[in-house]
Amino acid sequence: GLCGSGLIDLVAVLLCLGCIDAGGRLLPPELAPEDLRRHIRPDGQGNGVFYLTEKVYLTAADVRSLQLAKAAVAGGIEVLLRRHGLSACRLDRVCLAGGFGNYIDPKSAMAIGMLPEILPQRLFSLGNTSLAGASMAAIDPNKRCELRSCAEKCQYIELSGLREFTEAFTDHITFDTTED
């Protein structure tokens, strides 16, 4: 199968090549670019299945799952930026943490609309920040106080209950297939 970062990369490429439309539909072979048709088989429901190998392939359900994740991330970012009167282009840096931040190709995430279009040099991967913080707290008592102070400054926002998030989520479900 495909890992999450591999799925993002593959969908970004297939969007660019015209194998996936704005709605997330994996095109059947007869509608796909001619040079890629040998990788696509019909699924019996009007969609295509893109085969990398006989055992590794991309289905409509895979693309839909990614669209939901993409819409949640992009919608959340939009709401948080809007609440603070910011736009993505004004950010000095964006830090990505955890497995997501460690393995994702930011250019692919921007290509599918999961992350806002910003300069790649402004994106930083921080790795496993939870483990790093727990390790610091276990080793250094002074760090525990520093981390506690940092945690007290954090604000929890339940996005799922916000109308503005629901609207942003819906806006981000589709892929932008317009060329620059």
Enumerate the predicted regions with their spans.
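Helical "lid/coupling" subdomains associated with nucleotide-phosphate turnover
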Residues: G1-D180
